[in-house]
């Protein structure tokens, strides 16, 4: 059975997307790119650009499920808030199209794709290229989104992945 996964790396200015097909244990590249918003635009306009852009990706590539990177808290509270709003817009766009959504932290993505949680972005990009047999390196935000999609492909086949699609987590063998 084939699955098509849309991975999203949310950003307040650039939101990356990556689409892969999963057939058995094979992962195949479908598409990737970025949705860009204008930095000086009002928040409502930027949210609309994100929702419309994600809907266009969904309508074009018809994914069966989606994965989204979780927001990290950084030293700048305003930047964290903006990133959270962009992420909320992405989540809204996905659920409005009735896609099941799983969430992964940056640490989980790096561990899944590279094997260690403190891997630099360049190493993540390198592994995305290798895992999907790409001829070139995608733009950074698109590569991150492909890494999120690959992480979901790696985690979603078993029981834990099915729980993640329902928004549930397992830690230390316990449902949290």
Curated annotation (Swiss-Prot):
The EC number(s) this enzyme carries: 3.1.21.10
The family this protein is said to belong to: Belongs to the RuvC family.
Names of the cofactor(s): Mg(2+)
Keywords noted in UniProt: Cytoplasm, DNA damage, DNA recombination, DNA repair, DNA-binding, Endonuclease, Hydrolase, Magnesium, Metal-binding, Nuclease
Gene Ontology terms for molecular function: crossover junction DNA endonuclease activity; DNA binding; magnesium ion binding
Function: The RuvA-RuvB-RuvC complex processes Holliday junction (HJ) DNA during genetic recombination and DNA repair. Endonuclease that resolves HJ intermediates. Cleaves cruciform DNA by making single-stranded nicks across the HJ at symmetrical positions within the homologous arms, yielding a 5'-phosphate and a 3'-hydroxyl group; requires a central core of homology in the junction. The consensus cleavage sequence is 5'-(A/T)TT(C/G)-3'. Cleavage occurs on the 3'-side of the TT dinucleotide at the point of strand exchange.
Catalytic site positions: 9, 69, 141
Organism, as annotated: Chromobacterium violaceum (strain ATCC 12472 / DSM 30191 / JCM 1249 / CCUG 213 / NBRC 12614 / NCIMB 9131 / NCTC 9757 / MK)
Subcellular location: Cytoplasm
PROSITE patterns xref list: RUVC
Name listed for the protein in its UniProt record: Crossover junction endodeoxyribonuclease RuvC
Record's cofactor remark: Binds 2 Mg(2+) ion per subunit.
Signal peptide coordinates: none
Self-association state and partner proteins as the record states: Homodimer which binds Holliday junction (HJ) DNA. The HJ becomes 2-fold symmetrical on binding to RuvC with unstacked arms; it has a different conformation from HJ DNA in complex with RuvA. In the full resolvosome a probable DNA-RuvA(4)-RuvB(12)-RuvC(2) complex forms which resolves the HJ.
GO cellular component: cytoplasm; Holliday junction resolvase complex
Main EC class the enzyme belongs to: hydrolase
HAMAP family: RuvC
Binding site residues for Mg(2+) 2: 69
């Amino acid at each position: 059975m084939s699955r098509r996964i849309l991975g999203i790396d949310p950003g307040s200015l650039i939101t990356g997307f990556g689409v892969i097909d999963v057939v058995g244990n094979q992962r195949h590249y479908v598409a990737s790119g970025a949705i860009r918003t204008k930095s000086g635009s009002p928040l409502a306009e930027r949210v609309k650009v994100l929702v419309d852009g994600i809907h266009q990706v969904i309508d074009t590539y018809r994914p069966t499920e989606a994965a989204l990177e979780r927001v990290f808290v950084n030293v700048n509270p305003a930047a964290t808030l903006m990133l959270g709003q962009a992420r909320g817009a992405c989540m809204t766009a996905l659920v409005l199209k009735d896609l099941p959504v799983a969430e992964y932290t940056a640490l989980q993505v790096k561990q899944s794709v590279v094997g260690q949680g403190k891997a630099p972005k360049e190493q993540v990009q390198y592994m995305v290229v290798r895992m999907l047999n790409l001829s070139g390196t995608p733009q950074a935000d698109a590569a991150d989104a492909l890494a999120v999609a690959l992480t979901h492909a790696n985690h979603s086949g078993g029981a834990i992945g099915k729980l993640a699609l329902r928004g549930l987590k397992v830690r230390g063998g316990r449902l949290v």
